[in-house]
Amino acid sequence: MAKTPSSRAAVEHRERLGTRMAGIASDLWNIASKTRSVSIVSSPPGAGKTTTLVAICVHALATGKRIGVACQTNAQADDVCRRLKAVIKPQRICRFVSGTNAAPPPFVGCPVEKSALNVAGGPVVVVGTAMKWALIESAPPINLCIVDEAWQMAMATFLPLLRFCDRFILIGDPGQIPPVVSAPTQRWETSRNPPHRAAPEVLRARLPVHEASLPATWRLPFDTASLIQDFYDFPFESASLEGERSVTFDKVSSKGTPVVDAALDRLNRHSIARVLVPMPTAGGLAQSDPDVAAAAAETVVRALARNAKATAKDRGIELKKLEPGNIGVAASHRVMVQSVLSKLPSDLRGLVKVDTAERWQGLERELMVVVHPLSSMENPGEFDLETGRLCVMASRHQSGLVVVGRDHIGDTLDGILPSATQPLGRPDAVSRGLRQHRAFWSHLDKGEQSG
């Protein structure tokens, strides 16, 4: 096991990060309070985006301002309201809902309004989905609009916000899955203002924006921060130090597949392990790949059979026994999700969350089992090389990650020659994705070689 840092060093490390985060929130408000501006805040996974948002709201309310918060989903909006309640009087928080939304308020005492005209006067934080804000015809003045999970918002969804505010702070994770647009987008690919692209990407290219980035991931263990660093164009670290997070397992008499047990044992020393399934000697690979699905399911079953226990010294957790609800499985395709579910014992289905990368966004578990997106792909296409899904899946764990896949992935990545078919003037997303995939796989290779 890695050497555990002294408690003093660990405390000072996290105090330093907390001070930096507080300074970033203060600076963002100072910029927004002085002039019309757009600030873009890039965040690694689990870096305190909502904490930063709440801190900015506190600064703004203290000076009598009105803030609008545009979230991407109702669940995100409710979560923001609950987080605000911890530091702001409930009457200064308003949950903005659609006319057909019959959901209860996110907490007792939180005003819920269907019309912007009914929102109370004076300092207030109005929280709603971006789609709800887009439908507003008129509203009382908003001094600052904060966009939560901004890289999930298409530029077309951002534009209506300009009708009632001229100061914006966009906070989000640029490694996440790009906005989902159902309409054909080919005609906009060469546009200077592509409406289907993530709003921060377009604004950054067209306007003088203030840039900031959150300094650390508070969710991910020390060595996972370096694993996913290549998905981002800004540096960050982990709030946990080397040796503070681990998952340990009992030695039991029942026998499991050696490669699965070896991967689990590795989590006592590192936060990342890998289970490789040999390529079949004959025939091709199916998207449902029952062998890989079985390996992913067995990893979950063996972790529970061997009484998995998580330690996170930075969070005050010592040998917490993991229940089925503390373990998750992620895959990039629904077909593989169903295949894994079919291999799980019936008593674990519904207790262990098994879902696609899209549905894992914003969630976390102590231990994650991830089916590598290229595992069943012998000839990956552009969709397969897009790294948002891999980044999401590889950043949901708090203590341990097991990547499951076929053993051809490294050779497949080495054999890909990008075709550079991107539209004129657009970045070569395929080559970028290929570089990131190779860096990710190389990191796993080096980790295993280091023991």
Residue ranges and their predicted role:
Residues 1-38, 99-114:
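Pre-P-loop entry segment of helicase/translocase ATPase cores
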Residues 36, 64, 122-124, 142, ...:
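Short, well-ordered alpha-helix to beta-strand connector turns
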Residues 305-330, 335-395, 399, 404-413, ...:
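Conserved helicase C-terminal RecA-like lobe
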Residues 240-342:
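Conserved helicase/translocase motor-coupling segment
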Residues 110-161, 355-358, 371-392:
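Conserved RecA-like ASCE ATPase "motif II neighborhood" in helicase/translocase motors
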Residues 2-10, 26-31, 187-209, 379-451:
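Helicase C-terminal subdomain and adjacent C-terminal extension
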